[in-house]
Amino acid sequence: MRYWNRWCSAVTLLGFAAPLAAQGSGGAAMPATPVTSDMLLNAQQSGDWLMYGGNYWNNRHSPLNTINTTNVKNLVPRWVFQTGSEQNASLETTPVVVNGIIYFTSAVAPNNLVFAYDLKTGKPVWQKELKVASNAFGVACCGRNNRGVAVANGMVYVATLDAHLVALDQATGDVKWDVVVGDPAQGYTETMAPLALDGNVIIGTSGAE
C-alpha cells in the first residue's frame, strides 16, 4: 500500500453501510468518551476499535458479526473523506474508534494532521494540524506517513514526523502537551502509533524511521 499511494494525488477514508444495519440518518456521535485502562485491557471484547492493533495482543480481530462472509459483497459507501496525499507520502493510519467517533491521521506535507469524525455521518468533530520541522523530510526513510493515534484518559496521543509526541484533548483537539523524543538532525523521525498502557504512553524511535 505504501508504494501504490506514492503515485496517488489523494487518498480516501470510506465509511461503509451494512445492509442489515439500520439505514436511518443516525444521530450524532456521543460526546468524547474517555478511554480507561480497564477498557484497553478488555479491548478484545469491545465493539469499538480502541487501539492500533485492536488490543494488546495486536491480533486485529473484531468480535462484531453484523458484516460477515455472506453479506460483505453488499456493502455500499455511506460517506467518503479525502485525507489528501501526494508523491512521497502514503496513508498508513489505522483508525481508532471510540463510541461513534473515529480518530485517524494523515501526513500531508508540510505537517501532520489528526482528525476526529462522526462515524455515522462523516462530519468532522475536530481537525488538528501539527507543524513539522522541515529537516525531518529529508531523513524519513520511506516517505511521509503516520500510522495512527492512541486514545486514553481523555487524550489523543500522536507522534509527528519530526519526532515529537503530542497529547491532544480528546473532545476538542487542543494541544495539551508536546515533548521531543528524537532529533531529525541526528536522523531520527517518528511514524509509529503510540501505545497507551496503565497511565503511560509508550513510543519508540529509531534512525530514519
Where are the language model's segments positioned?
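Bacterial N-terminal signal peptides that target proteins for export
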Residues: 1-11
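N-terminal signal peptide c-region/cleavage motif recognized by signal peptidases
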Residues: 17-19
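Aromatic (tryptophan-biased) beta-strands that constitute blades/sheets of beta-rich domains
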Residues: 24-85, 123-138, 174-183
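Short alpha-helical segments and helix-capping/turn motifs at coil-helix boundaries
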Residues: 33-37, 99, 187-189
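Repeat-blade elements of multi-bladed beta-propeller folds
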Residues: 50-53, 88-113, 138-164, 189-209
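Structural recognition of the beta-propeller blade-terminating site
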Residues: 68-71, 118, 169
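N-terminal export/assembly segments and adjacent metallocofactor-ligating motifs
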Residues: 75, 112-115, 121-122, 200
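Mature extracytoplasmic enzyme cores
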Residues: 113, 164-176
